[in-house]
Every structure is written in structure tokens, then in C-alpha cells.
Amino acid sequence: MKKILGILILGLLLSGNAYAESEKVKTWGKNSQIPEEYYNPNLKTLRYHFLKYNKRGESQKKFYTKPSSQPSSLKFNLQKEPKIIKKISKKMQSTGLISYLMYENGEIVIDQLSPPERFGDLIDNDTMIYSMSMGKSLGGYLIGHAICKGYINSLSSTLADWPIVKGTLLETATVQDLINASTGDQKYIWNNQLDSGRDIGDLTIASITKKELANTKPGKKRFNYSQFSPNVALNYISFKTGHKFSSFINSVLKDHVGLAGKLRMNGTGVESKGVIQSNFKASRYDTLRIGIAILNDWNSDTCIGNYLKDVYANRVSKGVYNVGDGYSQSYAGFFHTNYPGISDTVMGMDGYGGVALLINFDDNRIVYTHAVHRNYNYNSLVLKAIDKGKF
């Protein structure tokens, strides 16, 4: 009997230790996020990394937009089936999903935010939330406006007029090459790492072109996903606007899109050195407003609408180098395209942790999720939802 009792006590102690271990915050180094293959992080770990990720760039010089005096209005018609809402709520109780918005035919039809016991005490409708890779797609949209405003001649223009890239593989790259992440830089760059080991996110364009890319020639023009091309694109806009990037993004995001609050992009140092980073912070509703503006632009007979269609028509295959969202098969102007099983015309913005904003131009639908981990069934809540409007 004593032996059995001892085994039971030992078992309780071990299970208690295992439980305590499971409730600890797990980290992956100073600047690391939760790896997506680490499938089931506990709530403390998710909350810790959400707060850490959302504080990125706070010490840097910031490129802000001002709130619009006449923000674009949002119409609500929350009438989706209860079982659909129940599925979203269930995922919000057990995964890294924080916010879910669906927009159809001019109205927000789903609007769900994480409950207070999960993330709802950390975020509300006015909280500026951070996304890195969605900033790549925003850069593609801003390039279109730079063309339409006359700062850049066309998609076929080269970067040869920019002194900072002289003597590098970027000198002969076209704007089209750049926004399709196909400048032939794969020998020197993989994801966010340079061949020297330096991280792109810590560097200016001037620093990279002076060191790693000095006297380089482009390789085969194929898709190579990284932060570098979108950083180059944003800083090329800065160069073409006389290094008045803040003024330019205000003309687009405040005046054209009609953001209700601020949008922030990061960068530190002298603007002419190429300091602007392809990330942004904005509220969940303002991020949706960007998607709505892109949808409306596509449906308009305007310069920016035609630009978006040209970009989509000239998309490139990701091939075997399919990194980024891991689902789409093609890339167009820093937007993900050609999602498996979806025949509609869809362009997507995608970020770390399951942050996604997909636009279905055929069905006039947008699905926008914010999350800290992609363990919420992306296939159903994003891909099936953008295709069918339900899941």
C-alpha cells in the first residue's frame, strides 16, 4: 500500500511540474518570434509575444500619417450565420487568433475581437497593431500611387537614376522586377539574411549597396522573397519625392484611403540613406480601410485601378521558392496571388503569425485576420472564407 501511495504522490508531483512548465512563457532568443511549427503555445507565451511584437520599432524615427478629417465611413451589417460566428469565437478561445473582419459588397458582415481573458484586454478598435510583411504589399500599393502621381514614369522604368544603387544589380532592375521580388538578387539574399550574415531589417539601403551588393550583377530574374525588395521600393519612392516620404504617404493614406487614425512606418537615421522599413502599425479598422481602398480602386476606371490590374496580369510564379504565406503560388506587386483551389481573382497581404488581408475582386469580399500564431485553421477561416464567404 505504501508503495502504491508513493507512486501516486510521485505521479502528482510530476504532473504538477509538467503543468507548471506548460504555463511558463517560452521564448526563442532576443528578437525571435514563435516559430509557426511550434503548434500549440500556451496563452502566456502568446500574450508575451503579441506585446513584444507590437512594440517593435518604438525607439526608431517614425513616418506617420495624420488622421483624415473625413475618414472613409464603414458600414456594418452583422448578419452572418450564428454557426460561422461560433467557429470564429471557438478559435479565439484556443488559438492565437485575435481579430477577425469580413467585408462583403460594401459592408462589414463579421466583426469579432478576442475576449478579455485571451487578448481583449490588450487590444481594442483603436489599438495600433503591427505587421511586418503586410507592409510589403502596402509598398506595392504605394508604388502604384507614385506612378499615378507622376513621381515614377512606369513599371518598366529602371532604378538607374538613383545614385544609391549605382554599380549594383539594382541599377538595371525595373520597377516591375522590384515589386515582383525578381531582381536577380538570390545569390546575395535569402529571406531576410544577406550573404554576409547581416540582417536586412537592421540596415539602410545605402549600407547594403555599399557592402554586400557593391559591384554585383543580377542573376536569373526569378522570385526571391525577402524584406529587401520592398524596403528598396519604399526608399525609391522617398528618393523620387525628394525625400518627402511622410508627405507622400499622407497624400495616399490620409487623403485617398481616408484613414481615421495614424499609420506608422519605421525607420531611423537620415532618410536619404534609405532608412524606411516595409512594416506598419495601424488600427484594425484602418487596416481594413486600406483593403477597401484597394478593392474600390480595382473596380474604378482610374490610373491606380489600371495599375493594380497590370500588376496582377504580370505576376510571377513562386515556383519551388514558395516562401512567405506558404499557400499562394504567384506574386504580383508584393501581393500574394493564385491561391490553391480558388479560381477567383484574389490578391493577399500576409504577415507573420497568421496576419492576413485577402481581397476577392470578383466577389467584392475582404477577409482580414490579426493573430500572433497561424494555428487557427488558416485554410478554413481565411482561404475558404475569401473564396465562398463561409466556412
Regions found by a protein language model. Name each.
Residues 149-184, 241-282, 299:
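Active-site helix/loop module of the DD-peptidase/beta-lactamase fold
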Residues 260-263, 313-366:
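Active-site Gly/Thr loop motif
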Residues 126, 189-278:
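Catalytic-site signature segments of enzymes, centered on catalytic residues
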Residues 7-15:
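Bacterial N-terminal signal peptides
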Residues 229-236, 276-300, 355-372:
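Active-site-proximal alpha-helical segments within enzyme catalytic domains
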Residues 106, 127-154, 178, 233-237, ...:
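Active-site SXXK
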Residues 21-40, 348-391:
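Structured C-terminal helix/loop/strand segments within mature extracytoplasmic catalytic/sensor domains
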Residues 19-121, 149-152, 385-391:
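N-terminal leader/targeting segments and the immediately adjacent pre-domain N-terminus
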